[in-house]
Amino acid sequence: MKEIEFDLLTEPWIRVRLKDNTVQEVSLTEALVSAQDYVDLAGEMPTQDAAVLRLLLAVLFTVFSRVNVEGEPEPLEKRGQALRRWSELWQLGHFPAEPIRDYLEQWKDRFWLFHPTHPFWQVPEAKIGTEYSAAMLNGEMIESKNKPRLFPLYAGQSKEQLSYPQAARWLLSVNSFDTP
């Protein structure tokens, strides 16, 4: 792959449920800095939500284990410090945007869905295995050529295609829950 495409930090791809019960796609950055505005994650399946939540928590744990609520460097050294820090974040009512943005900016080249050397959540050098269509990435499909699904959610060409936001969500889900 030669092209860099679909920035997960700025492009909307994480499905969230708003307080009025509508569902909207937001970027990774937006999901973190505006988390207080969302009721829930709203992916295609609960396991997909768990996989996305795992990524969101990994970013938050990394950021706030290194900086305090004011964004000043203060690495956690003891368990009690971690509990106090998360209590302070809870009392604040939102995650401070600047430390999150700073951390994500530092690693922005790792958040491209398509990238020649650092594709998100993928190993470009992996040549072992079998090539599959997009349908194999989609956890809602679960059918084979000889056993089609009785009441499919997707039909025709849409069975073989995923939008970039869908591909990002399913990539996380498959890597979290699909076992060899």
Predicted stretch roles:
Residues 1-154, 158-180:
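Conserved small-residue
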